[in-house]
A protein has these predicted regions:
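Conserved phosphate-binding loops in nucleotide/dinucleotide-binding enzymes
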Residues: 1-65, 79-92, 143, 147
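Helix-rich, typically C-terminal accessory recognition domains appended to large enzymatic cores
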Residues: 59-212
Length: 212
């Protein structure tokens, strides 16, 4: 695994990042302590401290488990070297925020407990896109290309479901299909982002998703 500057992550370079720190965050002081303690080559401590302060002047932010999980999926390519970038992690944290915002918007409408009924052209379009997503992801997973699978999930949810379909529902004020479609999407995305999908489902549908 290589860091943002392309260098291989190693203790001697002082560029190893503990996944726990990416999930919960860590202060600069604690990060320096972690990176410079118990080094096999104590003379590297000062150099490592300088690099750490430059890269993380305010420590490491909290990104959450699902954002990190999806980031790891996205870099699971067939390449010999894997590059880990904080910017990519931020992108998936934003994706989680997008999921929250979409769910909050949909929760503002009454859940009539109905099934999805493809009446309008936009209904038919999003249903077709969702079926295509399922086929693409199944093929990706069968070929061990989780990077492609998570990219398809990201593209569908952000660009198609949120930016196109939800916006169309706002314009037409036809929102009956939002709840049943969101439910199916949460179930589908659950293996990639289990914590946020479980919580959203529990809040909106008043039932645990994991039982499905």
């Amino acid at each position: 695994i290589r860091g943002e500057n392309g260098q291989k992550m190693s203790e001697s370079k002082g560029n190893i990042i503990d996944p726990i720190d990416l999930i919960y965050g860590i202060s600069l002081e604690d990060l320096l302590e972690k990176r410079t303690s118990n080094l096999m080559q104590e003379g590297l401590a000062e150099k490592i401290a300088r690099k750490t302060k430059k890269q993380f002047p305010n420590g490491i932010e909290s990104y959450g488990t699902d954002a990190l999980r999806m980031t790891f999926y996205s870099i699971a390519t067939n390449a010999k070297d894997i590059s880990f970038e904080i910017g990519r992690l931020k992108g998936f944290r934003n994706f989680c925020t997008k999921m929250w915002n979409a769910a909050r918007f949909i929760n503002g409408y009454e859940n009539k407990g109905n099934n999805f009924e493809a009446e309008s052209e936009s209904d038919k379009w999003i249903l077709k896109e969702f079926e295509q997503l399922k086929a693409d992801v199944e093929d990706n997973v069968n070929h061990y290309r989780l990077d492609l699978a998570i990219n398809h999930v990201y593209e569908f949810f952000w660009n198609k479901f949120c930016d196109v379909y939800i916006e169309e529902c706002k314009k037409t004020e036809k929102t009956d299909n939002l709840h049943p479609l969101l439910k199916e999407i949460l179930i589908f995305i659950h293996p990639f982002a289990p914590f946020i999908t479980e919580e959203i489902h529990s809040i909106i549908f008043k039932a645990p998703l994991i039982d499905r």
